[in-house]
Amino acid sequence: MPIDITRRDFINGAVIGAGGLLLSGCGNEVATEIPVTAGAPGVFNPPDPSAYYPPTQTGMRGSHEGSFEVAHELAWRGKKPKHYEALEEHYDLIVVGAGMSGLAAARYYQQKMGADARILILDNHDDFGGHAKRNEFHQDGRMMLSLGGAQNIEALSGYSDAARELMAGIGIDDNFIEFMNQQTPDELFLAGKMEAENGIAMPGANGHVTVGGNWLAAMFGGKDYEKSVRALPLPTTEQDKLIDLFAGHQDFLDDFSLTEKWEYINTTSYNRYLVDKVGLAESTLPILNAIVINLAGVSGWNLTVLEGITSGCAGIKSMGWVGKATAKLAELALDSLLSVTMFPDGNASVARLLVQKLIPAVAPGMQGTQDVAIARFDYSALDQENHATRLRLNSTAVGVRENNNNQVEVDYVQQGKAQRVTADHCVLACYNALIPHLCPEMPEDQKEGLSYGVKTPFVYANVQLKDGQAYSKLGATLFQCPYDPFQWVSTSPAVAVGGYEPPRGPDDPMVVFMMRSPMTGPEQPASCRDQLRMARHTVYSTPFDDYEQQIRQQLQSLLGKHGFNHETDIQAITVNRIPHGYAYAYLSLYDPKWEEGQAPHEIGRAQFGRISIANTDSEATALMNLAFDAAWRAVEEQTA
């Protein structure tokens, strides 16, 4: 039944001062310092509501209103301004995109060419960081943080030398990672504590049925797996099949030879295996898809059996010899999941550290990793004429080309004004799919390569609660919710790093972090890329009111039996809409195997004169360290 949303609820969830935010720009007249009150670390007065400070904005964030319309007019209809105001601004380097690749490219260039190098970074959003967005909430003098996108730092051992040096330069090295691990509570499953209690929640007759313990371990035949499965509101026959799958009671591929098994797991979808070989009903599949759909952004219909197993899906014990052969791959995948660390605002702190290195005046008092989470950022300092590096927000690039003066002209639109700037070099750190529209002079094969991949959409929501009383009674910090709009529900990262003081008990206000992937539903004949396009449309076309309704209903059903009342306990809602999320990773069921150097992302990322490309799309992998590698490559191309 729909939940009635009062006017107060709407105001709590609406974007506070959105009009002022979009119109205020980054002018000198806006003061953005957040005064720190005397007392415990992490205790703040709320920011001045008239100040330009995007992290405290609630309502619809991510690809927010005003960030995508100009680009869509260009990409969908070929429309852009005919005339531009030529600004008297020339730079050594212009970077299009202030996400991780863009910020890293600017930093690599600054380090190589000197602090006096003139750099301009343009971004269409009202905040920097790309997917690494910071969501900030205030209540009763306390600040609460959560992540609005990119979450974690993978093990530095997997970083290239260039990426490791970049991280070390902002204070993140092996010693700091170890410190972060020590500061991460053992019960915080979201931040890589895989031994922590984590559960599953399914709708029942009287609200959600929650099963605690360690559900992830249960899926691999761990402690109390049978008891956990028997507690699920499922027919006994389905429970029996799940128990067989988790425990490895039988080899579901025993009618195949070894060669046939290997062929099968590389050519058949994971979900088809569950239906045809394990005998599960399609209605049970969401239980087994809930983990991978948020880790990989696609469902078991899109992954082969092998890809599913090595992405963390259940069933490796139930494939006999071939399961043992793939166990090492699965172990490596799970080790990757375990080897993660997280700031309280996700990778937004990494973005803040990079921005402060590029433009020290944005946070002159910040010491580094020890206070990055609580440092006061002055957004009016981002785009100042007297700074060598400038970061210009709310600015959508619509054209990039070399002129006859051995320069790159960059056209962009900022708050309705069409403007042009020039540079000696340009790095495009935006989405691959936009680049052919920015640079129509590119070779056709390069434009085709850039257009091949389709980014994976997500929705990340953060919900500020008056206190943590009801949530604390669930018995775990994270629950998979396979039959709900948001498939993961967790506490926000309560990590005491960067100076942040997280909630200390159930009486403190808290933030609930919720993840949604739209890649659900039955098997489809369409390619995965077409399915991703349809899912992206779903994300774009769903209004905030609908997301708010879904959030309130889901939390009320999950927490209601513990005294939760959405009407009084929810203080604010931030929905981070991410239609263009993870970089497209090639999938065996849909994509051919290309010769080295001939894959679409490799053809697409070729240097184009004074223009280079740096993003995770160009690496076909959605990892921050590869965003840095792409940035390093682009800068090396332009400074060779």
Residue ranges and their predicted role:
Residues 1-18:
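N-terminal secretory signal peptides and thylakoid transit peptides that target proteins
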Residues 34-82, 136, 204-206, 413, ...:
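Conserved flavin/dinucleotide-binding core of flavoenzymes
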Residues 73, 81-263:
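N-terminal glycine-rich phosphate/pyrophosphate-binding loop and immediately adjacent elements
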Residues 47-56, 130-161, 312-333:
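Glycine-rich active-site loop/strand segments that organize a redox cofactor
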